[in-house]
C-alpha cells in the first residue's frame, strides 16, 4: 500500500486529506502548523487539519519550521512514498522533495502559472476574474513553480465571495486529487512546465488592501468587498470610526456627488457614490465594537443621512 504523508493546515485542506483516507491510501502522518491563539480570548486552537487527522488516529507533526534538520528527519522517519500538500504554508526543503519515490505534489487553488502564492482565492475575486480553478503540480523549492500534472476550472459567480469560492475549490481540489494520485503512482502522466512569462502572484493580503478607496470604480469596490469576505473584511470610516463592510450590491446611480458620499439611505442599507456611475448599496456592515449586522439594522441605529461622507475622519457638528 502506498504510504502518504499529508501536509496542510486550514479548512481548505480538510477535504483533500479526507479524500486520501477514503480512497484507501495509508496516510502515515500529517504535518501541519502549530496550534495558534485564536479569537478575542486568544484560546490556543489546533489547525482544522490536525483535528481531522486525530479523528482518524493519524500521527500529527507540528513544526514551526519544517526546514529544520530535526523536523526533516521526523518526516523522513515516516518513510513516505508520496508527499501531498494543500495550503500547508511552508516551502519544503530539498531533502524532503527528493525523498519520496513518487515525489511531492501540491493542490493549489488557481490555474497556474496565474496567482502563485498564499492568497489565490482572494486575488481571483479582487481581480474580477470569471473563472479560476485547481492545479496539481510537482513541488520544487520555488513557490508554486513546479511542473503541472492536472487542472480543473471552477466558475466564479458574480455573487461569490472568498468563503463560497473557497468551499467550491476545496471540493474540486479533493476530487481532482482523487483522480490524479493513481496516475502519479502508475507513472502515466505527462507533466507540463509552467510558462514563467505568464506567472502572476497572490501574496498574503496586507492591511492597506482592506481599506476602501471610494474614488475607485463601483465594480472594483464591489470585488474588493467580496474578495475580502469573510477574512480579513474591507473597511472604511464614518465619523472617525472604522466601519467594516461585509457585503454590497451594485446600483446604477449617476450622481455628481463626491466619491464616498452617502447619496441615499434606503431600507436595505446606505447607497454610496464611487468613482464612476456604479454606486454601492452597503447591505452588511459592522460598526466598531459591534457585531456584523444587516443594512436595515445599521440604518435604524447609526444616525447616518444623505450627504455624510465615508472614508474621511469627518465629525458631525
Swiss-Prot record:
Reaction(s) catalysed by this chain's protein: L-methionyl-tRNA(fMet) + (6R)-10-formyltetrahydrofolate = N-formyl-L-methionyl-tRNA(fMet) + (6S)-5,6,7,8-tetrahydrofolate + H(+)
Pfam families attached to this UniProt entry: Formyl_trans_C, Formyl_trans_N
Gene3D superfamilies on file: Formyl transferase, C-terminal domain, Formyl transferase, N-terminal domain
One of the protein's GO biological processes: conversion of methionyl-tRNA to N-formyl-methionyl-tRNA
Class of enzymatic activity (EC top level): transferase
Keywords: Protein biosynthesis, Transferase
PROSITE patterns documented for this protein: GART
Domain of life the protein comes from: Bacteria
Binding site for (6S)-5,6,7,8-tetrahydrofolate: 110-113
Keyword Repeat appears in the UniProt entry: no
GO CC, alphabetical: cytosol
Disulfide bonds: none
GO terms of molecular function: methionyl-tRNA formyltransferase activity
E.C. number(s) listed in UniProt: 2.1.2.9
Function: Attaches a formyl group to the free amino group of methionyl-tRNA(fMet). The formyl group appears to play a dual role in the initiator identity of N-formylmethionyl-tRNA by promoting its recognition by IF2 and preventing the misappropriation of this tRNA by the elongation apparatus.
Family: Belongs to the Fmt family.
Name of the protein in its database record: Methionyl-tRNA formyltransferase
Gene: fmt
Amino acid at each position: 500500500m502506498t504510504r502518504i504523508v499529508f501536509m496542510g493546515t486550514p479548512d481548505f485542506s480538510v477535504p483533500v486529506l479526507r479524500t486520501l483516507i477514503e480512497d484507501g491510501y495509508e496516510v502515515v502522518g500529517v504535518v501541519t502548523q502549530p496550534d495558534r491563539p485564536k479569537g478575542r480570548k486568544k484560546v490556543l486552537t489546533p489547525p482544522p487539519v490536525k483535528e481531522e487527522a486525530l479523528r482518524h488516529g493519524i500521527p500529527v507533526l507540528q513544526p514551526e519550521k519544517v526546514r529544520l534538520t530535526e523536523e526533516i528527519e521526523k518526516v523522513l522517519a515516516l518513510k513516505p512514498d508520496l508527499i501531498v500538500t494543500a495550503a500547508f504554508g511552508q516551502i519544503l526543503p530539498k531533502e524532503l522533495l527528493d525523498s519520496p519515490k513518487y515525489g511531492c505534489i501540491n493542490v493549489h487553488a488557481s490555474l497556474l502559472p496565474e496567482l502563485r502564492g498564499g492568497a489565490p482565492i482572494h486575488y481571483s475575486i479582487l481581480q474580477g476574474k470569471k473563472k479560476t480553478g485547481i492545479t496539481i503540480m510537482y513541488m520544487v523549492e520555488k513557490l508554486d513553480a513546479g511542473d503541472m500534472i492536472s487542472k480543473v476550472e471552477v466558475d466564479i459567480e458574480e455573487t461569490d465571495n472568498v468563503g463560497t469560492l473557497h468551499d467550491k475549490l476545496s471540493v474540486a481540489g479533493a476530487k481532482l486529487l482523487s483522480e490524479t494520485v493513481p496516475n502519479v503512482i502508475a507513472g502515466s502522466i505527462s507533466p507540463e512546465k509552467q510558462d514563467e512569462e505568464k506567472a502572476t502572484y497572490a501574496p498574503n493580503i496586507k492591511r492597506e488592501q482592506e481599506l476602501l478607496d471610494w474614488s475607485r470604480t463601483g465594480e472594483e469596490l464591489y470585488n474588493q468587498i467580496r474578495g475580502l469576505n469573510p477574512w480579513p473584511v474591507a473597511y472604511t470610516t464614518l465619523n472617525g470610526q472604522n466601519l467594516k463592510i461585509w457585503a454590497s450590491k451594485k446600483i446604477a446611480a449617476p450622481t455628481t456627488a463626491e466619491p464616498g458620499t452617502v447619496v441615499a439611505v434606503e431600507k436595505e442599507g446606505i447607497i454610496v457614490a464611487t468613482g464612476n456611475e456604479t454606486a454601492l448599496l452597503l447591505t452588511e456592515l459592522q460598526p466598531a465594537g459591534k457585531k456584523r449586522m444587516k443594512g436595515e439594522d445599521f440604518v435604524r441605529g447609526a444616525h447616518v443621512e444623505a450627504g455624510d461622507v465615508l472614508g474621511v475622519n469627518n465629525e458631525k457638528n
